[in-house]
């Protein structure tokens, strides 16, 4: 089992959230509490934000873990305040599919941390 990272922080005005390693339902709950609190710090000030979502090295304990993450992350309130979202994922079929089918200019998927961080920092 790999060590998990459920940390959320702010750097360069970007909310960076991590959900990596071997993840359980309890880990998603812990992650969401920190993630939501960080997003609300911007929302309360009437500010929009950029999100950098690190899911590289993510291994859910059970399919219900992925469903819970999806239900929590894709909250209308949280996403309606975003300027752009960058998803760092493992290379492979899922990343390829998401990259090829994405039609939104303010969303990007990649396995390359530096490329993705450059993109979100420069996104206007």
Task: Name each model feature, range by range.
Residues 1-124:
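Amphipathic, Lys/Arg-enriched alpha-helical "gate/interface" segment within cytosolic domains
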């Amino acid at each position: 089992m790999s060590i998990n990272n459920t940390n959320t922080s702010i750097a360069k005005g970007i909310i960076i959230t991590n959900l990596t390693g071997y993840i359980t339902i309890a880990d998603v709950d812990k992650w969401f509490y920190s993630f939501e609190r960080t997003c609300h710090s911007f929302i309360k000030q009437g500010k929009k934000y950029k999100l950098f979502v690190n899911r590289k090295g993510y291994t859910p304990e059970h399919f219900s873990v992925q469903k819970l993450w999806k239900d929590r992350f894709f909250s209308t309130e949280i996403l309606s305040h975003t300027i752009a979202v960058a998803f760092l994922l493992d290379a492979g079929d899922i990343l390829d599919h998401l990259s090829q089918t994405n039609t939104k200019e303010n969303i990007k998927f990649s396995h390359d941390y530096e490329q993705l961080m450059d993109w979100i920092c420069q996104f206007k």
